Structures are given as structure tokens and as C-alpha cells.
Regions:
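N-terminal glycine-rich dinucleotide-binding loop that anchors FAD/FMN and/or NAD(P) in oxidoreductases
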Residues: 31-61, 93-106, 163-183
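Short beta-loop-alpha junction of Rossmann-like oxidoreductase domains
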Residues: 27-29
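Rossmann-like dinucleotide/flavin-binding elements
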Residues: 1-25, 61-72, 79, 83-163
């Protein structure tokens, strides 16, 4: 959303200063493009990054974490803040609106942790209350890293929302063929 807001603003003639806290533009899409089966998603970020690079009214700043004071010092007339999305660690999701009780001794990993390189070993249980693509993709990633995986979902189907994109049967088949236990 941040890159698209910057691109659309530049297209409308606004001077745009794009401050990126890290070294890579594209937010979640830039991270998720490295997950199994999602490499094509990189086109979303690549297109916007290219469009921004062609505009004389756009300046990009990397490793530029800003606070409110820094933003005010710039003196911009309009400010759009895209802070990115983070996966919750406490189990709050679509079906569960209160945190799950957890055992502090048991390691918990979010998709953000796995995309950052952290990885469990051995048998892993994935609780998928996203119902779209992430649970299946995380299961595939962990199988590739040598884990055995049980995917648990409260939905009727694994990656249930992918019924709308006609991908659900293929996702289920692929996970079953990899040895993912689906409950």
C-alpha cells in the first residue's frame, strides 16, 4: 500500500519523499516473494519501484526510520504513513478475538519470524486462522527445511479462501503429497 500511495501521488504531480526503514522497498510483498510458490508476487513491488524510479518528483531514502518529530521537520503538506503489517504471536485472528494462553517455554513462530530466517526443527504444528494462502505456504516452507508438519485450521478446508481463486484443491493436493498432516 505504501509504494502504491507513493506511485499514485507522484503520478498526480506531488513531490514524494519515500522513507524506507530498511534496505528494500515493497513491504510484505517484497518479503513474501521469497516464499514457496509466491515468486511472481515480486512483480507487484518491482513495477511500483520501477515507476517511482522514473519520476523526477520522487526521492527515496533507505535505512530511514522516522518518528513524528522527524516527519514534522520535513514540513510536508501531506503525509502518508505505511507502517507495514505484522503477524500476531498471541493467536488473535479471524475466529479468535482473545489471545491464546501459551507456555513461555514453548517456542512460537509467526510468518514474520520464518520470513526473517528463524526456523523450528522437528515436528511443527501450524495453526492457520488466516484461511487464505499463508498457512499452506508456511507448511511448504517448513517441509522444505526438513520439518514434519501438522496444519490445523478451524475452516472447513485448508486455505479455504483459495476456493475463490480456484487454487484450493491444488494447494491441498500439494500439501498432502508433501506429507503435511491436515486437521
Amino acid at each position: 500500500a505504501g509504494l502504491e500511495a507513493a506511485r499514485a501521488s507522484a503520478e498526480r504531480g506531488y513531490d514524494v519523499a519515500l522513507a524506507e526503514a530498511g534496505t528494500t522497498l515493497g513491504g510484505r510483498v517484497a518479503r513474501e516473494r521469497h516464499l514457496p510458490g509466491l515468486s511472481a508476487w515480486g512483480r507487484v513491488a518491482d513495477y511500483r519501484e520501477y515507476q517511482l524510479s522514473q519520476k523526477a518528483n520522487v526521492e527515496s531514502y533507505f535505512d530511514s526510520e522516522l518518528d513524528a518529530e522527524s516527519i514534522l521537520e520535513f514540513g510536508f503538506e501531506n503525509v502518508c504513513i505505511a507502517t507495514g503489517a505484522k503477524w500476531r504471536r498471541d493467536g488473535v485472528s479471524r475466529q479468535h478475538v482473545v489471545p491464546f494462553p501459551t507456555d513461555g517455554a514453548m517456542p512460537l513462530f509467526t510468518p514474520d519470524d520464518l520470513m526473517s530466517g528463524a526456523a523450528p526443527t522437528g515436528h511443527v504444528v501450524i495453526y492457520d486462522d488466516d484461511h487464505y494462502y499463508m498457512g499452506g505456504v508456511m507448511a511448504e516452507l517448513l517441509i522444505q527445511k526438513g520439518c514434519s508438519v501438522t496444519l490445523v485450521t478451524p475452516a472447513a478446508y485448508v486455505s479455504e479462501w483459495t476456493l475463490n481463486t480456484l487454487e484450493q484443491h491444488e494447494i491441498h493436493r500439494r500439501l498432502a503429497n508433501m506429507g503435511v498432516a491436515i486437521e
